[in-house]
C-alpha cells in the first residue's frame, strides 16, 4: 500500500504541472476560437498533429529505454544518461539541418508552401523538445517531481504570456503607437504568433534545464546505445503508431472529406471539441509520468506478490478516477462548452466518444507494463500497428460519409481493439489478476448514472446541474464505501 501512496503522491505532483499547464493551454482555446475562424484554427490543429508525430520520432523511445537501463544493476546510470543525451542532441541537430536544407519540398508536402516559416519554427521547437525530453526524464529518475513541475509550468506560463502579448496586447499598441513595435510586429501574421510563442518558450526551457546537463562526466558508450536502441526501437514504432492513432485523423481529414473547400473548417471544429476532452488526457499524462518510474522501481525492489498487488491496485484506482472524470466532464458539458466559441458547438457530439477513447487508451497504457518489464517491447509495436490499421481503415471508410464524426468513431474503435489485444496477450505472457469484476461493476454504475444524468427530463439548467452533482456524489460514495476508503472525520461528523 505504501508503494501505491508513493505513486499517488508522484502522480499528484506531476499531475499538478500537467493539469495546470494543460488547463492554461486549454484556456487559450476560447481566445483562438474567438479570434480565428474554424479554417484558420484548423491549420493550427493540422500542423500540431505533425509536431506530435515528429516529437515521437525524434525521441525514439529513449525515455523508457533510459529508465530501463538506468535501473539495471549492471549499467552505470550516469553513463546511460550521458549516452542518451549525446544521442538525442545529435539526432535533433541533424533533423534541424536537414529540414532547413529541404524546407521547400517539405513545406509543399505539408500544404504549407505559402508559410514555410511556420514549418521552420515548429521544426526548431520539436528539435529542442526532443532533446530536453532526456533532462526531464532524468528529473523523473531522480524523483525530483517538484523541479520537473516548476520547469514545465514556467515553459507553459511563458508560452501563454507570449500568446497574450502577440495576439491581444500588440494589436492595441500597434493601433496607438505603431512605431513602438513595428520593428518586430506584423499585424497580419495571425496564427503565426502561436508558433513564435511556442518556439521561444521551448528555447527558455532548454536554458532552464542546463543544470541537468552539467556536473557529470560525458561518456558515450556505443555498445550501450545499441542495446538501448534495440530495446527502444519497438517503442519507437509503438510511439509512432500510437501518436498516429491520436493525430492521423486530423492529418487525413482534409484529404478525405467530400468537400475539399470545407476541409480545414472541419479540422478546426473537430480539433476545438477534441480539446474539451483534454481533462482525461491530463490525468493519463500525469499518471504516465509517475507510473513508468514506479513499475521499474517496483520490479527491481519488491517481491512478486507485492509488486503484482501494486499493479492491480494501480489499475483499479486508475479506472475509478477515469470514470469519475468522464462523468464530471459530461455532466458539466453545458458549462464547459463555453471554452470554445459558439461557432464550434456543432462538434460537441464527439466529446463523449473521445472521452471514452482516451479512457481505453489509459487502460491500454496500464496494461503495457508486462511487455516493458519482460523486454518484449515488440508487442507494444504490434498492438499499436493493429490500432493504426483500424484507424486508417475506419477513417477512409467513414470520413467521406460522416466527416469528423468518422474520426471520433475510428478513435474509440482503435483504442478499444488495442486495449483488448494487450489484455488477452498479457494474460498469457505475464499473468496479472486484474479485478475484472470490480472494473465491470464501476463501468456499469458509471453507465447507469450517465444515462440518468444525460436523459433527465429537466429544463432548468441550474437544477439539472445540481441533480447531476448529486449523481457524481453517488458515484464517489459508492467508490469510497466499496474500497473501504475512510472519509476525514470532519466530513462525517465525528470527533
Predicted regions and their residues:
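Interhelical loop/hinge segments that connect adjacent transmembrane helices in multipass membrane
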Residues: 1-3, 7, 174-193, 206-246, ...
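N-terminal membrane topogenesis motif
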Residues: 1-26, 75-82, 222-238, 312-316, ...
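Signature of the first transmembrane helix
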Residues: 3-63, 91-103, 125, 160, ...
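Transmembrane helical elements of multi-pass membrane transporters/channels
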Residues: 10-25, 194-209, 213, 222-297, ...
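Helix-loop junctions and terminal segments of transmembrane helices
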Residues: 58-74, 273-315, 370-373
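Interfacial segments at transmembrane-helix termini and the short loops linking adjacent helices
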Residues: 103-122, 264, 329-359, 365
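Hydrophobic alpha-helical transmembrane segments
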Residues: 120, 150-213, 385-390, 404-425, ...
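Membrane-proximal transmembrane or re-entrant/amphipathic helices at the cytosolic face
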Residues: 453-495
Amino acid at each position: 500500500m505504501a508503494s501505491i501512496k508513493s505513486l499517488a503522491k508522484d502522480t499528484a505532483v506531476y499531475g499538478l504541472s500537467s493539469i495546470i499547464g494543460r488547463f492554461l493551454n486549454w484556456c487559450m482555446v476560447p481566445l483562438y476560437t474567438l479570434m480565428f475562424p474554424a479554417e484558420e484554427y484548423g491549420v493550427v490543429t493540422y500542423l500540431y498533429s505533425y509536431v506530435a508525430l515528429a516529437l515521437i520520432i525524434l525521441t525514439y523511445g529513449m525515455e523508457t529505454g533510459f529508465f530501463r537501463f538506468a535501473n539495471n544493476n549492471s549499467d552505470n546510470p550516469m553513463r546511460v544518461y550521458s549516452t542518451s543525451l549525446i544521442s538525442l542532441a545529435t539526432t535533433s541537430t541533424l533533423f534541424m539541418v536537414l529540414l532547413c536544407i529541404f524546407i521547400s519540398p517539405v513545406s509543399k508536402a505539408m500544404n504549407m508552401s505559402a508559410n514555410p516559416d511556420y514549418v521552420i519554427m515548429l521544426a526548431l521547437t520539436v528539435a529542442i523538445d526532443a532533446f530536453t525530453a532526456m533532462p526531464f526524464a532524468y528529473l523523473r529518475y531522480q524523483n525530483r517531481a517538484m523541479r520537473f513541475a516548476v520547469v514545465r509550468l514556467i515553459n507553459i506560463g511563458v508560452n501563454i504570456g507570449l500568446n497574450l502579448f502577440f495576439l491581444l496586447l500588440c494589436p492595441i499598441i500597434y493601433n496607438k503607437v505603431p512605431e513602438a513595435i513595428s520593428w518586430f510586429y506584423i499585424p497580419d501574421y495571425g496564427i503565426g504568433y502561436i508558433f513564435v510563442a511556442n518556439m521561444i518558450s521551448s528555447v527558455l526551457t532548454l536554458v532552464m534545464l542546463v543544470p541537468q546537463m552539467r556536473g557529470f562526466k560525458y561518456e558515450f558508450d556505443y555498445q550501450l546505445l545499441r542495446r538501448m536502441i534495440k530495446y527502444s526501437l519497438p517503442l519507437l514504432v509503438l510511439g509512432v503508431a500510437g501518436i498516429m492513432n491520436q493525430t492521423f485523423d486530423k492529418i487525413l481529414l482534409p484529404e478525405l472529406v467530400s468537400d475539399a473547400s470545407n476541409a480545414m473548417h472541419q479540422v478546426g471544429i473537430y480539433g476545438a471539441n477534441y480539446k474539451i476532452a483534454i481533462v482525461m488526457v491530463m490525468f493519463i499524462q500525469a499518471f504516465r509520468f509517475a507510473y513508468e518510474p514506479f513499475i521499474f522501481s517496483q520490479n527491481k525492489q519488491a517481491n512478486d506478490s507485492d509488486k503484482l498487488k501494486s499493479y492491480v491496485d494501480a489499475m483499479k484506482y486508475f479506472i475509478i478516477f477515469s470514470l469519475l472524470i468522464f462523468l464530471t466532464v459530461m455532466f458539466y458539458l453545458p458549462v464547459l462548452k463555453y471554452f470554445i466559441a459558439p461557432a464550434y458547438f456543432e462538434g460537441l457530439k464527439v466529446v463523449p466518444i473521445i472521452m471514452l477513447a482516451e479512457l481505453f487508451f489509459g487502460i491500454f497504457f496500464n496494461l503495457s507494463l508486462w511487455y516493458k518489464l519482460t523486454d518484449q517491447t515488440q508487442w507494444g509495436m504490434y498492438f499499436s500497428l493493429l490500432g493504426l490499421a483500424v484507424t486508417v481503415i475506419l477513417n477512409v471508410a467513414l470520413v467521406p460519409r460522416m466527416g469528423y464524426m468518422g474520426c471520433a468513431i475510428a478513435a474509440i474503435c482503435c483504442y478499444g481493439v488495442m486495449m483488448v489485444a494487450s489484455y488477452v496477450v498479457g494474460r498469457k505472457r505475464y499473468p496479472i489478476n486484474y479485478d475484472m469484476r470490480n472494473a465491470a461493476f464501476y463501468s456499469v454504475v458509471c453507465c447507469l448514472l450517465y444515462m440518468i444524468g444525460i436523459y433527465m427530463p429537466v429544463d432548468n439548467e441550474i437544477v439539472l446541474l445540481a441533480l447531476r452533482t448529486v449523481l457524481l456524489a453517488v458515484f464517489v460514495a459508492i467508490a469510497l464505501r466499496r474500497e473501504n476508503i475512510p472519509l476525514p472525520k470532519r466530513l462525517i461528523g465525528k470527533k
